[in-house]
């Protein structure tokens, strides 16, 4: 059953990407971030009240720092969705597992522990190199279409997501529940979006265009909650790994959405790069789980 919950979560995140792509034609990135945050706050506050969860935290500074990193990643992801094929933007954002694996390898090398440099790191290094080779293949068509900058921003969204995830790991080790973490991230998102709107301005309001805004926060919150449910139902390490790898089904959903709704034309070399990233990211997830077997669910 946990597999169904994770596939549902991936579907919800991909559907949120569709809403972002449509809404980006009428609203700037700061507005999208703001509405995603405000609606997320309302939804998570209602959920916490219904479930009897307290939103009072002992580590506000850690939540604030997580929000800063997360907002940067989210803004970059929304920009990439607006300017790249949906599946391409989703794939680049889902590279957070690869970035985390790269951090683990880099940390082992910096610590200078001989045991960490041995064969145990070899497969992880190969997975990282394969993933970045996939990025080159994936972004090659984008460069031909003058989308190189958007591709770079999309790549940075995955890097930011990796930093945010490591902060979530630190927060979870202090006993903070997922509901509270998601709530305070939504608060930070709303505040950052409001500040951004003060700089970038507010777009003309049209109720037909605004219909794309409510799903942003709702789908994101539902996606995170169903992902958490999937992880919580995993009874052993193998089940957790299966759930973690099923998150990449979101790329498949995004590809289908892109073909059906937006007519995205991704050349064969782009599909090959996407497949290589998915395979290497799954490998990195499995190998990374050995270093952090009790890590919390990743957020998007």
Go through each PLM region and give its residues:
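Cytoplasmic-side transmembrane-helix entry/capping segments in multi-pass membrane proteins
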Residues: 6-7, 58-69, 116-131, 150-155, ...
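Hydrophobic transmembrane alpha-helices of multi-pass small-molecule transport proteins
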Residues: 102-105, 120-140, 269-288
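Helix-helix packing/entry segments at the starts of transmembrane helices
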Residues: 89-95, 175-188, 225-257, 287
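Loop-to-transmembrane-helix transition segments
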Residues: 1-9, 49-78, 149-157, 204-222, ...
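Transmembrane alpha-helical segments that form core, pore/gating elements
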Residues: 44, 142-204, 296-300
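Transmembrane alpha-helices of multi-pass small-molecule transport proteins
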Residues: 2, 27-72, 100-103, 160-164, ...
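Specific alpha-helical transmembrane segments that line the substrate/conduction pathway
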Residues: 31-34, 38, 81-116, 240-257
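C-terminal-most transmembrane helix of multi-pass membrane proteins
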Residues: 111, 244-300
């Amino acid at each position: 059953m946990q597999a169904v919950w994770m596939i549902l979560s991936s579907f919800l995140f991909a559907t949120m990407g569709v809403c972002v792509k449509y809404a980006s034609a009428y609203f700037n990135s700061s507005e999208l971030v703001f509405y995603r945050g405000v609606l997320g706050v309302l939804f998570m506050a209602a959920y916490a009240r219904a479930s009897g969860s307290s939103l009072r935290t002992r580590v506000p500074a850690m939540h604030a720092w997580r929000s800063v990193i997360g907002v940067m990643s989210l803004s970059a992801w929304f920009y990439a969705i607006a300017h790249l094929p949906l599946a391409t933007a989703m794939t680049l954002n889902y590279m957070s597992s690869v970035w985390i694996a790269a951090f683990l390898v880099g940390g082992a090398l910096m610590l200078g522990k001989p045991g960490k440099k041995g064969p145990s790191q070899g497969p992880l290094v190969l997975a990282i190199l394969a993933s970045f080779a996939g990025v080159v293949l994936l972004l090659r068509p984008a460069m031909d279409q003058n989308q190189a900058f958007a591709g770079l921003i999309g790549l940075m969204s995955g890097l930011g997501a990796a930093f945010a995830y490591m902060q979530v790991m630190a927060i979870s080790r202090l006993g903070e529940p997922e509901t509270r973490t998601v709530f305070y991230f939504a608060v930070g998102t709303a505040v950052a979006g409001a500040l951004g709107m003060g700089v970038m301005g507010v777009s003309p309001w049209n109720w037909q265009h605004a219909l794309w805004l409510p799903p942003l926060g709702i789908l994101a919150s539902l996606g995170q909650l169903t992902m958490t449910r999937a992880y919580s139902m995993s009874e052993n390490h193998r089940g957790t790994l299966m759930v973690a790898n099923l998150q990449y089904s979101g790329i498949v959903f995004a590809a289908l959405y892109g073909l059906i709704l937006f007519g995205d034309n991704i050349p064969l070399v782009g599909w090959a790069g996407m497949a290589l990233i998915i395979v290497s990211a799954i490998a990195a997830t499995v190998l990374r789980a050995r270093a952090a077997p009790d890590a919390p669910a990743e957020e998007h």
